[in-house]
Amino acid sequence: MNSMLFSSLTIAGAICGYLIGGGFASGQELLQYFASYGLKGLGAVAVSFLIMVFCVVNFLTVGKKENIQNAHDAFTYYCGKKAGSFFEFIAFTYLIVQVIVFFTGAGATIAQGFDVSPFVGSAIMGVLVIITVMLGLRKLIDIVGSLGVLLVVMVIGITGTFLLKNPSAIIEGSEQVATMSNILQPSKNWAVSGFLYMTFNLLGLAAFMPLLGQKSESQSENVFGGVLGCVAFCGTIVLVMLAFLTDIGNVGTKLVPNLYLAQQLHPTLASFFSIVILLGIYTGCALMYWNFCSRVVPENSKYYKPFVIILGVFGIIFGSILPFDVAINIIYQIYGYLGTLFLFFVIAKFFMKKKSGK
């Protein structure tokens, strides 16, 4: 029993760790996809939860049942060879696109936290990531990546503390946000927003979750761990969203809303939180950039380092031009709609298996 509980908690932690990175910690995506709708955002969270729990549990259990060994196997299982290759390619392109978003997020975080130009932050993050990927400093990424737990704890602690300061302001904030036009939204409809929030994450989850499920000891662990991870993740979204609503007039003007909350609690806390966010961005960014570059050009090729440098410079340029909120709004919407197409395949496969009794 204890072994099953530990394994389930490990699965739940992996789910949250995958989804809660530097981008989530900034709060910008949660502002757009949930808080911008006021208390209707709770409905958006519910929509996200339903899609998430269905897909995550399905991915985990299929991974074990079908002995999925890699992302190619997963996409082929759900979509067939041709469509599977297409979605695998889309998931692959998401790596480099997300790197650009991370560069933009680093620029916004440093600009808001230390009052410098966003280009400085994007450039510093870009150079660090390029050097890391060129030199193969995988161990450094693993060490910094262990701070992911601290990032999650700080987000929960900061937003929870801020929420407790004035919980009665939630209703007022919900009414106020309806009159604000400066906050970008993925859709005018809260339900569509909740739907897109999970579908833009879907291709990445489909590439990762089946492999996680394949390594578990039992399907019970997969189901319990999957549901627990979804509850924890969506519960964190609710906490952050409600905290935003208590001061939406100011939060809605910030590119890094969670950092603003930390600044209101204590300047030292805000400075430390800025660094933790940047380390979270660095970890996710370096891993994604490494995976992308090494799949395009082999690491032992003489073209590998020039490719890493040139592509990284382009990433820095795009990352410093695009405002963080605009980057999230446009890019995540595009991948949300692509993820919606993939969701149809997942649902169709589920019912086909049910019908055949397999």
Set out the residue ranges of the language-model regions:
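Membrane-interface loop-to-helix entry segments
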Residues: A106-A108, S117-M125, T132-K165, I328-V346
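Selective recognition of specific alpha-helical transmembrane segments in multi-pass small-molecule
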Residues: V45-V56, V99, L150-F162, F224-G249, ...
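Hydrophobic alpha-helical segments and their helix-loop junctions in multi-pass secondary transporters
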Residues: G22, F92, I96, V129, ...
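Transmembrane-helix boundary/entry motifs in multi-pass membrane transporters
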Residues: N2-M4, S36-L42, K65-Y94, Q112-P118, ...
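Membrane-interface interhelical connector segments
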Residues: V177-I183, F244-P267
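Extracellular loop-to-transmembrane helix junctions
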Residues: L5-L9, Y33-L60, F224-V238, Q333-F344
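Hydrophobic, membrane-embedded alpha-helices of multi-pass small-molecule transporters
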Residues: F6-A25, A44, A91-L95, V99, ...
